Amino acid sequence: MDSNPCQDVSGDTSSTPMANNNPTNDSTISSQNHSKIGLRKHQQQHYHQHSHSQMHSHSQQSPYINQLEYFTNNQFSRSFNSLILEDANDANTNNSSTTTLNKKTINKSPPFNIKQDLLNDSIDTFLDNSNTETIEDGDVTTTDDDHDFDDEDIEDPEAVQYTPTLNILKSKKVDSFDIISSKHRKSNSQITYNSHVRKPSEEDTSSSMATIRLSNNSQSSIKRSSKYLNLSIDSNLKTVDGGKIPDEIDDISLNEIDVAVAPNDFSSPLSARKPDIFAAITAANGNSNNQFKRPHKLVSQSPSPSSKNKFRISSSTTSSPQSNLHSPSKLGSKGFKMFKNANRDAIMSSSRVMTPEKPKMVSKIFGKSAKIRRAYTPTHTSTPMAVSSLNPPSSSTSNSTTAAITSTSPPANEHYDIDNDFDSPSKNRKSSNISASSIIIYQDENHIKSNHARKSSNPIPYPPTEPLPTNISASVAETGKGSTTTKSNLSKGCPLFDDKENKASYQFVKPLQTAFNSSGLVKKNSISGSSDRKLPPETPIKRNPLMILNTNKVVPPYSSGFAEGKDVMGDQHDIYSHIPCQNQRFPGSVNPNTTTNNNNTQQHHDSDLSIEVGRNNSYDASSSTINNTSYIKIFPSSELKKEQVLQRPQEDLELVFNSDIELDDNIIPETPTKKSLLPNQHHQHHLPLYTQSKSPLLKFDTEKDGRRNLSIVLDKSNATKREISEPPSTPINMSFAKNSFKKPMNNAERGDDPDSIIAQRIDIMPSLDEADSVSVYPSKIDEHLIEKFGMKNIKYIGSGAFSIAFECLFNNEKFAIKRTKKPLIGKLEKQTIKREIEALRVLTSIKEDEATNMQEQEEGKEYLVYFIEAWDFNNYYYIMTEFCEGGTLFDFLEENKHYKIDEFRIWKILIEILNGLKFIHSKNYLHLDLKPANIFITFEGSLKIGDFGLATKLPILEKDFDLEGDRNYIAPELINDKIYTPFADIFSLGLIILEIAANIILPDNGTPWRKLRSGDLSDAGRLSSDNISMFLQHNPNTNSNISGSGSRSGSGSTGGNGSAGDGSTNSTNFSYNSLSGNSLTLNPPVKAVHGTSDTNNTLASELSKNIEGLIPSWAPDFLVHGDSMNLDKLVNKMLRPNPFDRPSACNILEMPECLIVENRRKCGATIFEGEFGSPPDE
């Protein structure tokens, strides 16, 4: 036992090469050469058979044989690099005096460049028995010198011999095995080894099996030939001896990619992670050829066409010793992670062929967690194993790998169905079949870290929904001595349960959002959005300190309007019965003479009244939140109604409010609603307020004219001017700001005392549609315009991205004034606004010469918004133009989005916009921002182009000129090539017509956006309207001329090809009810099949004749016959990607369709004249 490295029961001996990275031992081995020669370490494992056991030597074969071509199939590229590994074998087993080297050439496909040992990447074959030697046990250490070996250290290149690298595996079946507990300590690394014994009933004479025994002094030293593995793609890579690697050497098989990986050594500094726990051990075949199978993720895994041998997947107890291999792709945490799962174990090749009689499926564990679904106990029995436990000396060499194999193997008579543990939830997960020898387990090195703690008898906490992992189940099944399992050790080693559902890849997985997007263009009528854009409600917890009502205190009889001893709130619905008001928007009308009793409850049953005056808990869906901010809703004096006037206007009334909060900035918290009783205007009712001694008392006066105006007079002892004059901070109190427009008061109105507080009026946020709403929002107020034109003549209209629009009444004529949102200080900003003003002066200004104006009118100037004047004030620029009462085309389309506009109006819209563009282009100008929001509608329904903010004069001389309009309507050449031509406006107009005709929402990005700019209009559907059906829809009595047979059919066809439309339009299908007599069905012929073809054809022809008789004779042909598709063809030309392929405005206006519509129409573009237009003049 002392001299033989390994001895079985029969007495046969064989040497097992072991790794030795000790520099001291290296000097002993390489003393003759005076250089450090690293020795490669391997385990030559033998199997014990019950009947007879004999050792088979691993014979060497030349790599240049047909077998190599069988494996590689000549499919590997020559760019794959060769890894040259050399093994030194000592002939003398006692003193390790002699050393022989075996050079092995192995190709590695990935272009790795690694400077250290690849975590015991033992991708080399096992040595023959004749070349092996043993080393003293004391020489084996765990130290690994990074500089102990190099390619240049080999002095005898002739001693290097090639060894076989590829062979066929024939795995053996072992049905039962036992587990002997083992200890893995970091101090002395004492390992208890287990023996695997095969059942006598299943002998296989083809190969013998031996028990693995590693004696105390039976360690051979094999060092790696090179620590610097040059794996870069270099065709000139040379071997150690200086020779070039032959091109035909490609010793990697596609069928050998997936094999259990178990490193032999983890002593390298690079290998921070431990080797795998489980290593598959497969018996050698008759040829005893050394084999390895390297997992790889880049090499194609398709089966070799010339493969004739069948491979069985190695089981956890019958895998080949050659399976103790590591791929360069499986590096530690400090290694190279060139792939997504570079730190994971090997994947299983799909090219592996299983034996038909023993079908197996490989189940692997990836990562650091293992999920075991259930344990299975086979029906057959197993023979007890003959245990052989030997204690090698203290070392942490490759012996620990065997310990990991034996100590963590599954227990006997149990099989675990292990899931493929992938990180990504998108990968397939397949369960393995129940077979005792079909498990190949790959695990990371962290399992070994806590391996010594897995035999504890203490219960290990696991999630109740997760079963035990394989290694834990095995150790729990045992009853052995070991260290105590601690939670910290378990957490440091590896997660002991499958926690993939809690991993980031599962927690943050989201569906592909584009899958929920529309596959095409969205119809406007398919979007159901609320018509009113409401403001968010106020925070309910923000209470006004001055408006809190105390319902527990009795109101003193300060006013005759209150009953004595009554609570302020009275009944829940009686709060306003105490408030005499002239003009209040309450849920029910309140009689000022009504007393406080329960009879008034029914007057306020429509809403729940808040106990806090100034807030409303109920919101009306038909009005905005602004209208519901308070029940104390006061209208302007112009909206007073006689029935709402108080019967006793001369009587002073007081309403009591209690507030327990001192009106002091140091006490009252800083809330947005803090200053609620600040100056404002326009109230026509009195709201008397009573407060305690700490809070101010608000009194109310009556003007001399007898009309009650709410005025707040605070007690001068408790209130100060500073508290009232401070500006508010929320929209509710914006009307109380300093800039509120109020008439100046004279001294008589203020009172004789100059220190008295001015009586002010209160207005609680009038609605946006009220005439005086300008005074509510400071952003909608312009002091300069008010001073210039008067407050009554200025009205806020709306705002855009860069400007605010006002309506101005000047000399009894309305104008529109556009003001910049912000003061323009920068040079570029001023140039932009000046360029717009210049364009307006050139294009739309009214000339002094009347003849010139008339000529320009005929050329299309009338379809542009007229320019009046422009000026600046305090860096704000004002542009005064013509006012269009009809709003914008965008608003018009929104109002009519629920049905399709008739084609005649579409042609009218196209003609009017083209006339305006023709005039713009004739002046060598480009609009570049044409969209419905910039097209205005006059009172007569005509269209006018406005907003020349991006208008540019041609030619463009600026090198860095870059102007882009709305991305929904922008032409593609403006983005890609910066080509500014008049055809860019034609493209924008084509998209406007497409939007109107198809009733769609133009996309602003994505695939539909790109398709529209590539000439693909397939998503839009048909653009030409079915004017016949629309004509019949708007003429409900015309169906009386239809025969009864046609009406009984319930559906029919117009007879024209495509004249009935298709399902892509909203106006092609109308239900027909023979009983109602006011509607008609015009369905496509496909939907009209209800009987025999002859009957349907007869009914369709009769219906077609009757319908054609209803069409007026003067109707344009292109509107009657739906197969003409004139509008579709025109839009396709306008939206061509090449700008020079598009027609000009003049060319489109010269089309016959445009000429016919222009001659027939009598109204503006937005006025409906019928599906076929107005009849011609007699």
Curated annotation (Swiss-Prot):
GO-annotated cellular components: cellular bud neck; cytoplasm; nucleus
Entry-linked SMART domains: S_TKc
Catalytic residues, chain numbering: 929 (proton acceptor)
Positions with a binding annotation for Mg(2+): 934, 947
Regions of compositional bias (Polar residues) in chain numbering: 1-35, 299-308
Example GO molecular function: metal ion binding
Binding positions (ATP): 797-805, 818
UniProt xrefs under InterPro entries: CC_SR_Kinase (IPR050339), Kinase-like_dom_sf (IPR011009), Prot_kinase_dom (IPR000719), Protein_kinase_ATP_BS (IPR017441), Ser/Thr_kinase_AS (IPR008271)
Function noted in UniProt: Protein kinase that acts as a negative regulator of entry into mitosis (G2 to M transition) by phosphorylating and inhibiting the mitosis-promoting cyclin B-bound CDC28 at 'Tyr-18'. SWE1-mediated inhibition of CDC28 acts in a cell size or morphogenesis checkpoint to delay mitosis in response to defects in growth, actin organization or bud formation. Plays an important role in filamentous growth.
Protein name per UniProt: Mitosis inhibitor protein kinase SWE1
Organism whose genome encodes this protein: Candida albicans (strain SC5314 / ATCC MYA-2876) (Yeast)
Gene: SWE1
